């Protein structure tokens, strides 16, 4: 006889606390938003669209390129040389911005009209007028440090934006395989089917959704499995067409790291190179065999530049080809007597058919298509519901009643003849 001692209340409260903390942690992980991966749009931060959202990517690339060109245009304006000084031409002279009215250039020398009385070291009461000759102005005008810093910032900013836009365009247009794009497409499909299962088990609220027959308009019961499946599919499609979901993809999606991206790209390139080399070897082998079989006299002259092992191999291939050709001409195929003009598959041949060469394969296949025969003789009814369940779905206990409709693992095949 055994005595069962229930656990103390403290342990229950501790377990409940841990369970609640784990649940809150899972909710926080689900609500966490990850920045979508990109090579040249990282400056946009969380506004970067999903890797398979091509309209969104091209929109951001266009805006980023326009801002980069604007920055270079501002740099060009800062690098513009200042306008020339006022040049005296006869009685007319042009006045440029930032100059004194009395400043002009005559015969390559800068002169400033000044009154001697304006200088305090000279006679203040003198009314004599004269020209003060200054040194010629520098070819490259001196600029302040602030202008130099502005040039540097505008140049770096514009070059950075344009280089990033070019990098992203290269990824979108020149890469035949993009791991980020393929991953996002698979995540969207999984999310779509998970939503179907989720909405199917949630059921239909009669106060919010009413289902009517498309033929006569009579209301249908919301407990019918087919109706629940149709409503779940419609709700999943509406959520997939949400503008936020179309722009970012599923919000809980966590993209792969850049290292994993590079590893997948490297694996794809290695496999592509492997299959390409295999295809080239096969084509070269077929071409070599055809050349040997058609020109046996010239094949011996082409063996001079090859190694000994390759020479022996090609000679063996040539001998086998000649043996097969000679044996095929000397030995005739045995003639079999056909007792009936009806094949085992129900194909009726014409009465004048004496050999395989008298059969019109195109006509026979059009009349006795095996796939069409299989389709007419077979009727399949397959119902498939994904087994993926949402994480927050309540696990049924032994006392809970099973929900109506098919189970998540239901897969029925019905075959009738």
From Swiss-Prot:
Region described as Disordered: 1-28, 391-417
Biased composition (Basic and acidic residues): 15-28
GO biological process: protein catabolic process; protein import into mitochondrial intermembrane space; protein quality control for misfolded or incompletely synthesized proteins
Domain of life: Eukaryota
Major localization class: mitochondrion
Record-linked InterPro entries: i-AAA_Mgr1
Transmembrane feature ranges: 57-73, 152-169
The UniProt record lists the keyword Hydrolase: no
Membrane topology: Multi-pass membrane protein
Other information: Present with 3410 molecules/cell in log phase SD medium.
Quaternary assembly: Component of the mitochondrial inner membrane i-AAA protease supercomplex composed of MGR1, MGR3 and YME1. With MGR3, forms a subcomplex that binds to YME1 and to substrates to facilitate proteolysis. Interacts directly with YME1.
Purpose of the protein: Component of the mitochondrial inner membrane i-AAA protease supercomplex required for mitochondrial inner membrane protein turnover. Together with MGR3, functions in an adapter complex that targets substrates to the i-AAA protease for degradation. Required for growth of cells lacking the mitochondrial genome.
Protein name: Mitochondrial inner membrane i-AAA protease supercomplex subunit MGR1
Source species of the chain: Saccharomyces cerevisiae (strain ATCC 204508 / S288c)
Gene for this chain: MGR1
């Amino acid at each position: 006889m055994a005595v069962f001692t229930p656990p103390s209340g403290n342990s229950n409260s501790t377990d409940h606390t841990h369970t609640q903390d784990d649940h809150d942690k899972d909710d926080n992980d689900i609500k966490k938003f990850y920045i979508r991966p990109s090579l040249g749009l990282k400056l946009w931060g969380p506004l970067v669209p999903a890797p398979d959202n091509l309209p969104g990517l091209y929109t951001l690339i266009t805006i980023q390129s326009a801002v980069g060109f604007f920055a270079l245009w501002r740099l060009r304006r800062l690098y513009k040389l200042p306008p020339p000084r006022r040049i005296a031409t006869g009685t007319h002279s042009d006045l440029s911005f930032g100059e004194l009215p009395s400043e002009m250039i005559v015969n390559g020398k800068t002169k400033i009209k000044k009154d001697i009385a304006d200088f305090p070291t000279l006679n203040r009461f003198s009314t004599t007028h004269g020209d003060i000759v200054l040194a010629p102005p520098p070819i490259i005008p001196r600029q302040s440090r602030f202008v130099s810093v502005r040039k540097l910032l505008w140049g770096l900013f514009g070059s950075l934006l344009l280089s990033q836009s070019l990098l992203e365009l290269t990824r979108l247009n020149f890469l035949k395989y993009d791991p980020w794009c393929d991953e996002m497409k698979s995540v969207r499909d999984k999310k779509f089917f998970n939503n179907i299962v989720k909405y199917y088990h949630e059921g239909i609220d009669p106060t919010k959704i009413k289902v009517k027959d498309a033929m006569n308009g009579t209301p249908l019961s919301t407990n019918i499995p087919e109706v629940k499946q149709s409503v779940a599919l419609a709700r999943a499609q509406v959520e997939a067409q949400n503008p936020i979901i179309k722009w970012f993809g599923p919000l809980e999606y966590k993209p792969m790291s850049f290292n994993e991206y590079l590893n997948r790209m490297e694996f794809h390139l290695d496999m592509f190179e492997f299959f390409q080399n295999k295809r080239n070897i096969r084509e070269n082998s077929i071409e070599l065999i055809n050349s040997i079989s058609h020109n046996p006299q010239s094949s011996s002259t082409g063996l001079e530049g090859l190694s000994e092992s390759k020479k022996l191999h090609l000679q063996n291939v040539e001998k086998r080809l000649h043996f097969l050709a000679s044996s095929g001409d000397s030995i005739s195929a045995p003639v079999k007597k056909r007792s009936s003009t009806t094949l085992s598959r129900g194909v009726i041949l014409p009465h004048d058919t004496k050999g395989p060469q008298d059969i019109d394969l195109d006509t026979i296949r059009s009349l006795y298509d095996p796939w069409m025969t299989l389709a007419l003789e077979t009727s399949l009814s397959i119902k498939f519901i994904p087994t993926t369940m949402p994480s927050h779905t309540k696990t049924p206990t032994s006392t809970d009643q099973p929900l109506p409709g098919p189970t998540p693992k239901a897969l029925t095949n019905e075959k009738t003849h």
